Amino acid sequence: MKEETFYLVREDVLPEAMRKTLEVKKLIERKKAESVAEAVQKVDLSRSAFYKYRDAVFPFYTMVKEQIITLFFHLEDRSGTLSHLLQVVAESGCNVLSIHQTIPLQGRANVTLSVSTRGMDENIDLLMNKLRKLEFVEKVEILGSGA
C-alpha cells in the first residue's frame, strides 16, 4: 500500500468542491444538518463530490497538537488485535480517551478510538501509516477532531 503524505494548502487554492466538502463536514459535525443529503444541498455540492473528497480533505486543526481525534478501524477478529493496536497508538504518544468495539461478526470487528494528540511524538500521517501496516487492520480513517 502506498504511504500517504499530507500537505498544508491555503484554502484559496483548493478547488471549490474540496472547500464545499469541508463545509459539509462542518455542518454535520456541528449538527447544523441532519444528513449528508441535507448538508450538501445547503452548500450546493453533489453527493458524489462529497464522497469523493470526504476522506481526503481535512481542516488544519485536525493535524494540530492538543486536539482530540476520533479514529475508526475495521479489524480482523483475532486474539490480541486490540492490544497491539493500542500499543502502537500509545507508542506514538497519544492518550486513549475512549474505546468502543462492536461485537465481532463474520470474523470482523469495528473499533472507534478517541485519542488526545497533546503528547504525540510524531505527526498524524506517520501514525496513520503505521496503523494501516498492521496486518489485522483492514481499514483506518479519521472520523473527526475537536478541541
From Swiss-Prot:
What's the family?
Answer: Belongs to the UPF0735 family.
Q: Which domain of life is it from?
A: Bacteria
- What is this protein called in UniProt? UPF0735 ACT domain-containing protein BLi02918/BL01157
> ACT domain spans which residues?
70-145
Question: Which NCBIfam families does the record match to this protein?
Answer: PRK04435.1
Q: Which Pfam families match?
A: ACT
> CDD domains of this UniProt entry?
ACT_PheB-BS
